[in-house]
Amino acid sequence: MSKNSKAYKEAAEKIDRDRVYSPLEAAKLAKETSSKKQDATVEVAIRLGVDPRKADQMVRGTVNLPHGTGKTARVAVFAVGEKAEAAVAAGADVVGSDDLIEKIQGGFLDFDAAIATPDQMAKVGRIARILGPRGLMPNPKTGTVTPDVTKAVNDIKGGKINFRVDKQANLHFVIGKASFDEKALAENYGAALDEILRAKPSSSKGRYLKKVVVSTTTGPGIPVDPTVTRNFTEEPAQS
């Protein structure tokens, strides 16, 4: 849906720019303002009150969305031997070691997440400049550097997402599809927000959640009340 299209303008007119919405209201509006031609992804953007230039204010983590993302992630696994066999059995889409690294160096990036066993990380470091900027570098903090490749693959295939603050102090993550029930979207939002709040750096001062916007890939942004940090599926009290 182009921002200049009639459909986009009509969708944008449904949003009151003089107010902020509860997570449940935002989920309903996201569904209403999404293009009817495709099952659009519902995304969240959050501006955090942190300084990402400071190492102690880096916000990152993972969350298992209770209702999944609506998309089965493609997973790459760096492993050999029995661990590689376990990754294949768990449903990994591409598994390898030096061969997979060479393939990625050649331009292959047809996967949404990457997992590595600890013994492979020295090799994977050779492609850190390729994977890192795309948020694909395996990391122990997100559970993607692990000897238990079966669990890691199952978690990601089951709706586990990663979040990481960017240089502008923004977080971006997916909470589902426009075809989801609004309560499922609100519950996914709540699960992610709980983890983001838990990840708040102790050195962060002032307001942590500065701005929250929900949108679909085809629709306008919907401002969400950043002070709502519980009871995500409740209708707001009418004033």
Swiss-Prot record:
Entry GO MF terms: rRNA binding; structural constituent of ribosome; tRNA binding
First and last residue of the signal peptide: none
Sorted UniProt keywords: Repressor, Ribonucleoprotein, Ribosomal protein, RNA-binding, rRNA-binding, Translation regulation, tRNA-binding
Function description: Binds directly to 23S rRNA. The L1 stalk is quite mobile in the ribosome, and is involved in E site tRNA release. Protein L1 is also a translational repressor protein, it controls the translation of the L11 operon by binding to its mRNA.
GO cellular component: large ribosomal subunit
Subunit structure: Part of the 50S ribosomal subunit.
Family: Belongs to the universal ribosomal protein uL1 family.
HAMAP family, A to Z: Ribosomal_uL1_B (MF_01318_B)
BP terms from Gene Ontology: regulation of translation; translation
Gene3D superfamilies xrefs: 3.30.190.20, 3.40.50.790
Disulfide bonds: none
Protein name (Swiss-Prot/TrEMBL): Large ribosomal subunit protein uL1
Organism of origin: Mycolicibacterium gilvum (strain PYR-GCK) (Mycobacterium gilvum (strain PYR-GCK))
